[in-house]
């Protein structure tokens, strides 16, 4: 099988994005920082040049989509106000509007995200990897459950066992087959 793979260098990507924005809007350092597939734009420079942040984010996302290995590029505006799909839902759950970047890059499966700053490289995998989920405790009966469980079932299940209210952000029901 010939699965398409490659290396995605985020530092090179941000350098090219900054050059694209300079060609479009004039001189300046538009990309302030990047970390963990997120790109942070220089908001002070955008305000100084009286540029619309949403427009710059959308143009940047469209430009990033042209890179090899990029599956999707999401702007902060699209994540906060866009339509809900399973892919956006997964990324939206890890997004915080005050701390996360202006652009989030989703790399194709099989591609390696190369970190020039550190020594760790991240291989992107979107395939299902089965792993056991084990609950142990006084009132937990031994059982094997055949229903699929996602990570967002864990917090409400633990709260259910401890007989406390589930966290406010819980969207899933607890696993009740264990009692």
Give the label of every model feature segment.
Residues 1-111:
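Secreted, luminal/periplasmic, and some membrane-associated catalytic domains
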Residues 44-51, 141-147, 161-163:
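Second-shell loop/turn segments in exported
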Residues 50-55, 145-152, 169:
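Soluble non-cytosolic domains of exported or imported proteins
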Residues 65-69, 159-167:
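Sec-exported extracytoplasmic/periplasmic mature domains
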Residues 99-100, 108-140:
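C-terminal, low-complexity/hydrophilic appendages and adjacent surface loops
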Residues 105, 133-135, 154-159:
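Beta-strand elements within well-structured catalytic alpha/beta cores of enzymes
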Residues 164-177:
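C-terminal beta-strand edge segments of enzyme domains
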């Amino acid at each position: 099988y010939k699965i398409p793979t490659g290396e995605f260098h985020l530092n090179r990507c941000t350098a090219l994005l900054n050059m694209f924005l300079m060609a479009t809007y004039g001189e300046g350092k538009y990309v302030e920082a990047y970390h963990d597939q997120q790109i942070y734009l220089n908001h002070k420079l955008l305000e100084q040049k009286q540029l619309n942040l949403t427009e710059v984010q959308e143009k940047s996302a469209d430009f990033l989509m042209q890179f090899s290995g990029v599956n999707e590029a999401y702007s902060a505006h699209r994540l906060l106000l866009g339509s809900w799909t399973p892919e956006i839902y997964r990324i939206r759950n890890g997004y915080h509007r005050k701390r996360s970047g202006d652009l989030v890059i989703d790399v194709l499966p099989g591609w390696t995200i190369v970190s020039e700053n550190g020594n760790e490289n991240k291989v992107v995998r979107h395939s299902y990897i089965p792993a056991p989920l084990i609950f142990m405790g006084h009132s937990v009966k031994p059982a094997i459950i055949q229903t699929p469980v996602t990570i967002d079932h864990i917090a409400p299940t633990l709260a259910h066992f401890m007989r406390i209210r589930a966290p406010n952000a819980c969207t899933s029901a607890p696993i009740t087959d264990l009692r």
